[in-house]
Every structure is written in C-alpha cells, then in structure tokens.
Regions:
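Short, conserved phosphate/pyrophosphate- and ester-handling motifs at nucleotide-, phospho-/glycolipid
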Residues: 37, 121, 213
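Short, glycine-rich nucleotide/cofactor-binding loops
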Residues: 112-123
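Ferredoxin-reductase
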Residues: 1-92, 147-149, 160, 176-178
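Reductase modules of NAD(P)H-dependent flavoproteins
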Residues: 141-245
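A short, basic/flexible loop-to-alpha-helix module at the beginning of a structural domain
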Residues: 98-110
Length: 245
C-alpha cells in the first residue's frame, strides 16, 4: 500500500527532547486500526535531504479511528528527528505507511501486565497503557519507568491520568540523576531495581513488556530471568537496528 498523506494537527513538547505529533488524514477518511505497541512509517521529503527519508515511530495512544499520535525524540545527528523538531509545523503534510510491527499487547483480561521502559522507550508502553485503560483491564497493571531526570521524563501526567482509569494500577519511577526541582516526582534514584516489585515477579501468568536502549533491556531481562520469570512472559522491542537481547 502506498503511504497516505496526513496533516500535522498538533505538536506538543512532552519533555526537553521529545515532541508529540497528532496526525489526521488529509482525505478525512478513517485511519487504519492498529495494535497498541505498533509503529508508523513516517516518510519525509525536504529540499535539505539528500534522499527521501523513512523512519518508524511508535504510536502513543489507543486506536480511535480518526487520528494518530506519535512521539519523536530529538537525536543530535538525526536527519528526520531534526526536521520534526526544528522545521515541522502545524498544517504541514507528511506521508505515513500503515501501522506495523510484531511487538504489541497480547494479554487476556485475567493476566496482570507490567510495562517497563527507559527514556523514549515509553512510547509503545504508553499506547499499551491506553489500550488497557480503554478495555478497563481488570487484572493489575504496573508501570515502571527510568528517566535521567524530570526535564527528560515525558508524559508523566498522562501516565498518571490514564493509570487512574484502571481498577488496579501502580507506577514506580527511577531518576538516574534527579535535579533539585524533581523532588516528589520520582520514587527512587539510580538505575531500575526490580526488587521493589519482587512480589509481582513470581505471579505465574504476569506478562512483562520492555522497551528502551539495548543495554537497559538486557539489564532488566537479566533481573526478570534471575527472579524466575519464564522467558515466554518477557516481550521486548528494540529501537534502531535489531539486536537480540
């Protein structure tokens, strides 16, 4: 299928380095459905680019039929992220390929779910959280996130508001190097240590979803496996070139 033209409807600064983009189809037709956790292919052409550029960005919300929202981290050398952060404006048109990806939420209503992320890796998790909230997921849902500090912690309020729609939700946040202004915004300093949720690690059917830098995911997967979580209950997504955790 050819990419479809979408108009940038809204741009919001979600952290010092992450902006979200709300995108609506130029033709006004309903948008293709997707599974929470999937991504869009974003096609960008600009006179400054040597080539037509394509990047994948995770959707950050539950399917709603009328628009998409993605979040983009500004990478220092990033051609497309630089364009999205520096040049893109409301009203601009970009082309999108249909949602795709084999990392998505698959949890029966009876299954507890833990969503684990670091940095911009929270984007597919946010979509999963919205998906669980839309279904009023009856089993417990836990949100674990690691950020550098409060200025780099995106979507904190949205996570709290969305989690509040679930019957059994709790979240825990680690800041590696908190700022003075961060008091009260995080639970622990340093790197993510799953011993704080030790009781969840031995639940027989709990599903764990991970997204973040490769080193982070290896670190978390090792903690999960050491705690006895079965390999088949650990689901992960690697941003960038795919490597095996």
């Amino acid at each position: 299928a050819l990419p479809i033209s979408f108009r940038i409807e809204a741009i919001e600064q979600q952290s010092e380095v992450i902006k979200s983009f709300t995108l609506t189809p130029v033709d006004g037709k309903p948008v293709a459905d997707f599974q929470p956790g999937q991504y869009l292919g974003v096609h960008v052409q600009d006179p400054d680019f040597a080539n037509h550029e394509i990047r994948q960005y995770s959707l950050t919300h539950a399917p709603n039929g009328h628009h998409y929202r993605i979040a983009v981290k500004h990478e220092p050398q990033g051609t497309v992220s630089g364009w999205m952060h520096g040049k893109a404006k409301v009203g601009d048109v970009i082309n999108l390929a249909a949602p795709a990806g084999d990392f998505f939420l698959q949890a029966a209503p009876s299954m507890p779910v833990t969503l684990i992320s670091a940095g911009v890796g929270l984007t597919p998790m946010l979509s999963m959280l919205h998906g669980l909230a839309a279904e009023k997921h009856p089993a417990p849902v836990t949100w674990l996130h690691a950020a550098e500090n409060g200025s780099l912690h995106a979507f904190a309020n949205e996570v709290a508001e969305t989690g509040a729609q679930l019957p059994h939700f709790h979240s825990y946040t680690w800041y590696r190097q908190p700022l003075d202004a961060d008091a009260g915004r995080f639970n622990a300093q340093g790197t993510m240590d799953l011993s704080v949720v030790a009781s969840e690690l031995n639940e027989p059917d709990r599903q764990f979803y991970l997204c973040g830098p490769v080193g982070f995911m290896q670190f978390i997967a090792r903690q999960l496996l050491d705690a006895g979580v079965p390999n088949q209950h650990i689901h992960y997504e690697v941003f960038g070139p795919h490597k095996v955790v």
